[in-house]
Amino acid sequence: ARELDVPFKRTGKLIVGFTDEHRQRLEQFMARGEANGVKGLELIDRKRMDELDPSAGGNFAMWCPASGILDPFLYTIALAENAVHNGAEYHLNCAFTGETRQADGTHLLHTTRGDFHTRWVVNSAGLNSAVVSGHLGIPGYVIKPVKGEYFVLDKLAGQFARIPVYPAPNPDNTFDTHATPTVDGNVLVGPDSQLARDFQDYESTQAAMDGLIESGSRMFKHMDRAYFIRNFAGIRPKRIDPATGAVQDFVLECREIG
């Protein structure tokens, strides 16, 4: 963040729990973090939580002092600019339509703005990653759009929020609604998780907002409608295993094409 001149604040993070089952998950999560070299992780009680951030919900928590917050919008732009400075090129409004394997093992990628010759293809197309895989001759990927809604709280609420507060992870290692202060002084509360109607389903619903208020109140004690200034929705891809129906967030693998 410093190198890219992106606002960053070292806040730490609380991953909170309410039940014995949550405590067991946090213990497992903490062991995994320590195995991965994360320093300073602690399981703390409510008294210690109040010292760190009395606005946080939960009966106990895993404290992660190395965590922080930054501006995700400026960070994304900075990464794009840095890539250009290092030789990357962007071809906008350029849809990938197919691929032809060359005799030397390289690939000719066909797009709506001409062909591109390459040795490697990195599929990071998100919601359209299954379409890209299909064009490359790799079937079997099914992507379902999952919608998540957020509330943006006024900076009057931000004065109470010192630290990002997340719930104990679910058994599949996903997280539900959390409360995160921003570098600008607001608070983001969300997301929820809904199966979207399609890849463009950005509509906010009253039922979802009511549910978000309830779940957000468990994370942030100052969740009050008087602080609400904006709500929005985003779509994230979930890969569905056709054989088992299992949901996967990320798939990292290397495949031969053709």
Predicted regions and their residues:
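Dinucleotide-binding Rossmann-like beta1-alpha1 core, especially the glycine-rich loop
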Residues: 1-52, 58, 174-177
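Central helical "cap/lid" subdomain
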Residues: 115-161, 205-206, 223
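A short, glycine/Asx- and small/polar-enriched loop/turn
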Residues: 21-25, 52-59, 100-107, 241-246
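C-terminal catalytic lobe of FAD-dependent flavoproteins
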Residues: 72, 78, 174, 183-184, ...
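A structural signal for short hydrophobic beta-strand segments in well-ordered beta-sheet cores
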Residues: 16, 98-99, 179-180, 252
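General small-molecule cofactor/ligand-binding pocket signal
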Residues: 41-44, 89-91, 229
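Helical element adjacent to the flavin cofactor pocket in flavoenzyme catalytic cores
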Residues: 63-120
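Mid-domain catalytic core of redox enzymes
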Residues: 149, 155-185, 206, 218-219
